[in-house]
Amino acid sequence: RDLRMSRGLGDVYKRQTEFRNAVWPLYEQPAREKLWSGGFACPAGNYMTLVDFGQTKVTGGKQGSKSNSTKLYTIPGDPCRAPANGVVVLARNLALTGNTVVIDHGCGMRSYLYGLDALSVSEGQSVERGQAVGALGEDLTMDFKLGSKSVNPWLLFQTSGGLFWKENG
């Protein structure tokens, strides 16, 4: 048995476990009141799309699942900006995703920003649309979720009206 391989798998398991423990509980957090107003904006100013939302992944020539996130090629050092008003619920370095920021926009809507070069916000901090939350690296992976369901970010960005939310009752 190759010990290097088993150590490598153990490291992957540790990174995945750390990610699950930090991020997955956010999927089930109770929704707070709506914090955004107007449209959502792309967190990167200058970018090229590397992996688009819904794009089919191909590994080893075999077709796989569809991407739940969007990966952008970005300019290192440029600001990564809050896509909408909200509260930072996670801002830390995770072994699997690097510097990670999660913003709760209310009503169960959250943005997950992975792979930043640096963080400039802290957990519990309120942020406004367009406010820098960190510095971009070579690429940014962004995932927008309503609860635990991923949302196509381009639909959020294409209108100034934003995501509409109707209160029950």
Spell out what each predicted region is.
Residues 61-64, 70-73, 100-105, 143-145:
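Short, acidic/hydrophobic/Gly-rich beta-strand patch recurrent on exposed beta strands
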Residues 2-13:
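Short, small-residue-biased leader/transition segments that mark boundaries at the very start
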Residues 14-40:
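Acidic/glycine-rich phosphate/pyrophosphate-binding loops and surrounding catalytic core
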Residues 26-34, 50-82:
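Short glycine/threonine/proline-enriched tight-turn/helix- or strand-capping micro-motif at secondary-structure
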Residues 82-117, 139-141:
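Zn2+-dependent peptidoglycan hydrolase active-site motif and core
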Residues 79-89, 121-136:
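Short, well-structured beta-strand-loop connectors
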Residues 51, 74, 90, 115-118, ...:
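A residue-level detector for short acidic-glycine micro-motifs
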Residues 101-102, 125-169:
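Conserved, short, structured surface segments that act as functional micro-motifs
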